[in-house]
C-alpha cells in the first residue's frame, strides 16, 4: 500500500511548531545530523529573491531571517497549521499560501512563476513510494528560466549511534521516510531536472543548489 504524504506532515501541530526551532534547528541539527542551522540559513542569504516560493515551510525560521529581502513570498505545504503559523511569522509581508501535495503535478498557474525556490528538510519527511523525484520535477516547472532553487534533506548516513537510533524511531513513526535516501539518489534527481546544480554533504545532510530547469 502506498503511504500518504499526510503521514509525514501530521506531526506538525501548533504545539510542535512552537518547539520546532529549539528541537529541530538547534538540538537535532547540532548534535544528531551535524549540520548547523547557520549553514542552512546561508543558503537563503545567498540565494533568496524578492519573488520567492518556500516548499515545506516548517516554522518559517529561515524566511524570518531574510524577510528584508522579500517583496512577496509564496508558501506551499500540505499542512494548514504550518501555512497559518508561517504566514503569521511573516505578517508584515505580502504572503500567499497554497495547500499542495508536492508529490502530485502542480497546476499550470505556478509554471515559471518564481525567481527563487527553497525546499528545506522536506524530502526526508515524504513517503517513499518511489516518486520523490516528482518534487524536483515540480520545482523545475515552477522556477523561472533564470531563477535559482535550493534546499537540503537528511539522508540515511549517520555518524553516531544516537543519530541512528533517533532516525530509526522517526522512520518507524512515519515522521521520516528516508531509508532509501542517499547522496546518489538526490544527485540523480538534480541531474534529471536541472542543467546546472551543486550538491554537497554536511554531516547527515545533503545541501543542493540548482538552476537552468529542464522542462
Name the predicted role of every residue range.
Residues 1-47, 167:
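Conserved class I S-adenosyl-L-methionine
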Residues 193-215:
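Core SAM-dependent methyltransferase catalytic element
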Residues 118-121:
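A conserved beta-strand element that flanks and buttresses the S-adenosyl-L-methionine
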Residues 66, 138-140:
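Class I S-adenosylmethionine-dependent transferase superfamily signal
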Residues 126-138:
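A short, conserved alpha-helix within the catalytic core of class I
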Residues 53-106:
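Class I SAM-dependent methyltransferase SAM/SAH-binding core
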Residues 146-154:
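Conserved beta-strand signature within the Rossmann-like core of class I S-adenosyl-L-methionine
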Residues 161-184:
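Conserved Class I S-adenosyl-L-methionine
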Amino acid at each position: 500500500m502506498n503511504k500518504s504524504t499526510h503521514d509525514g506532515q501530521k506531526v506538525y501541530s501548533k504545539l510542535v511548531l512552537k518547539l520546532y526551532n529549539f528541537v529541530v534547528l538547534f538540538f537535532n541539527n547540532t548534535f544528531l545530523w551535524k549540520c548547523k542551522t547557520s549553514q542552512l540559513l546561508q543558503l537563503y542569504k545567498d540565494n533568496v529573491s524578492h519573488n520567492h516560493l518556500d516548499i515545506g515551510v516548517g516554522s518559517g525560521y529561515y524566511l524570518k531571517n531574510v524577510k528584508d529581502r522579500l517583496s512577496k513570498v509564496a508558501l506551499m505545504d500540505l499542512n494548514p497549521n504550518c501555512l497559518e503559523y508561517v504566514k503569521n511569522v511573516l505578517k508584515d509581508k505580502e504572503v500567499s499560501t497554497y495547500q499542495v501535495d508536492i508529490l502530485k503535478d502542480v497546476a499550470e498557474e505556478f509554471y515559471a512563476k518564481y525567481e527563487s525556490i527553497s525546499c528545506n528538510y522536506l524530502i526526508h519527511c515524504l513517503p517513499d513510494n518511489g516518486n520523490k523525484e516528482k518534487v524536483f520535477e515540480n520545482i523545475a516547472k515552477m522556477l523561472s528560466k533564470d531563477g535559482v532553487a535550493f534546499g537540503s534533506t537528511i539522508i540515511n548516513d549517520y555518524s553516531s549511534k544516537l543519530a541512528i537510533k533517533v532516525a530509526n524511531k522517526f522512520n518507524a513513526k512515519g515522521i521520516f521516510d528516508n531509508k532509501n535516501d542517499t547522496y546518489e539518489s538526490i544527485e540523480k534527481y538534480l541531474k534529471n531536472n536541472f542543467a546546472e546544480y551543486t550538491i554537497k554533504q554536511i554531516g547527515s545532510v545533503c545541501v543542493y543548489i540548482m538552476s537552468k530547469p529542464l522542462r
